[in-house]
Amino acid sequence: MKFIILQIKLLLFFLICFSFIVKAEEPKKITNDHEFNFYSGTFDFSDDGKRSTIIGFQHQNESLVRDSFLGVLSPVTGAMITADNATYMYTGVQAQYDLGKVKFTPSFTPGIYNEGDGKDLGHLVEFKSELQLSFDLFENSQLGMSYNHISNASLGEKNPGANSYMFNFLKQF
């Protein structure tokens, strides 16, 4: 038990220190109001029976970016569809950590899921947690990879969840 408490304290310490480092950076001037993320990959890659191709689109409004002790936060909205016609529409929050040419963007987005002919995730309401790493290609373009987990947080009688990975192309307009 003491070991778990120590781990939690260390995690909180590093999160707070990291947020001050990010906060200390000079804020970048926003020249483009919108960032679009086009992605494709494999939905539920860890389940051989329900694995499927996925494509999606996400929008981030750069004019709504806010600094916080957790870093730079912004709202995101998007949708995805699998080859089995499962769909997920979501909106939530994304943190942005600028590490030079590399961007790290974790996000949390509640949404509405329809299984179509795909995997039954157990509930209409699902929650997506995602980690994304992207690299600057050009001034307004990035290429990245992301991993996410979609789960209903035990709202339904069953909660199988789905793990997915995607390749991302991000463009600011």
How does the language model describe each region?
Residues 35-44, 70-82, 105-114, 146-151:
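Transmembrane beta-strand segments that form the barrel wall of outer-membrane beta-barrel proteins
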Residues 59-61, 95-97, 135, 149, ...:
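Residue-level signature of outer-membrane beta-barrel architecture
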Residues 1-31:
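Cleavable N-terminal export/targeting peptides
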Residues 103-129:
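Mid-chain, well-packed structural core segment of small domains
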Residues 24-33, 47, 63-73, 98-104, ...:
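Short loop/turn motifs that connect adjacent beta-strands in outer-membrane beta-barrel proteins
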Residues 84-108:
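Helix-adjacent hinge/juxtasegments
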